[in-house]
Amino acid sequence: MTGNPISVNGKSYAWPQAPLVVVCVDGSEPAYMDEAVAAGRMPWLAGVREKGTDRIADCVVPSFTNPNNISIVTGTPPSVHGISGNFFYDPTTGEEVMMNDPKLMRCDTLLAKFADAGAKVVVITAKDKLRRQLGNKLDGVCFSSEKADEATLKENGIEGVVEMVGMPVPLVYSAELSEFIFAAGVKIMERDRPDIMYLSTTDYIQHKHAPGSPVANDFYAMMDGYWAQLDALGCTVALTADHGMNAKHDPETGEVNVVYLQDLIDGWIGAGKARVILPITDPYVVHHGALGSYATVYLADETERATVTEKLSGLTGVREVLSNAEACDQFELPPERVGDLVVTGERHMTLGSSADKHDLSGLTEPLRSHGGPTEQRVPLIVNRAAPGLASDTPLRNFSIFDVALNFAEVPEQARGAAE
């Protein structure tokens, strides 16, 4: 262990003075914590808001899981790390590709770099889809609760996870998938005292339940209890989210609010002349039906761009239509992994491809989803004061390691607990 600052992707990060636990609460619109605290369900967080750092940050757009988790662990926007969504279209091969492969990443993670310098690093995700990218080049522990029973020393740096935690492997579509992460995190912190731990949950609850609802408050109360345990173990606990979440349905009928872009564009310029890609698409579509508030459009004929842009811009529920250059400049995206046009939806509107391509039968509650700038505001909270961090400093969710390592003040007793 060096104890010296580490330079990663052009930025210097101080060595952790106490065990650092960074938590990405998937889909955590700020109102979830606000409502749970107001209801008295998060006493630990209520105390942290008094003594620690409590800010609002902007996530990456598209406000989806993969680009934001990779931004958080690299400290960079997608223009640097290359992950532009959960899913993208490669025009050179004509294939639509899940963005789960570490080969698609263009820079190293803080996690791998700290481990290379001697830090003990642990990564636990809910869904296995993220594990390989978060663990890219990482010499440490990295496993998912989804496949915790399959973890091996060779592949994951740990074995016997289920026995250690004392919980069965949860269903993918459950609150317990996220709880398993925290239960495992506490056990590992007690046993091994890693220097850095990254915990990334699933947004199953947020997709189904609004802020302040009984189920949502129960979920946040559960997390609050585990965070309190990590705090009591002397950890610096830093919280953020990959994106927010909004209702995307008619409040009267519960019907999904959606504009099917592929159907419309085909009607305007003819079938086969455009391809609509929805970067929210991932292997776990039951809770969102692959409907979010961000889409990208590839055009076979560049001369159609003005027509398609004008028509899309006039649609009710469409927030903005940007060219590739405009979108990549505004959202800091890699141009070659974005279409000719980027379309974002209004707060309560989703964007689909063709109506017959979306199976909404799994939506047991009115749709809540994300993807656009209207889901960009997320919490950034640390259980330490950061007096050197100016109150007007604009923050991103991928500022969380910077704030926690370079600005948060660790008390002497916590430093002692880290030894």
Outline where the language-model segments fall.
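Active-site-proximal N-terminal segment of extracellular/periplasmic enzymes that hydrolyze or transfer
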Residues: 1-53
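Secreted, luminal/periplasmic, and some membrane-associated catalytic domains
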Residues: 18, 25, 55, 63-64, ...
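Structural motif
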Residues: 22-24, 196-200, 238, 342, ...
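Short, structured active-site-proximal loop/turn typified by the sulfatase FGly-forming signature C/S-X-P-X-R
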Residues: 34-75, 122
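His/Asp/Glu-rich, glycine-adjacent segments
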Residues: 73-210, 216, 287, 293, ...
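Active-site glycine-rich loop that binds ribose-phosphate moieties when present
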Residues: 180-181, 221-223
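Low-complexity, glycine/alanine/valine/leucine- and proline-rich hydrophobic stretches
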Residues: 344-409
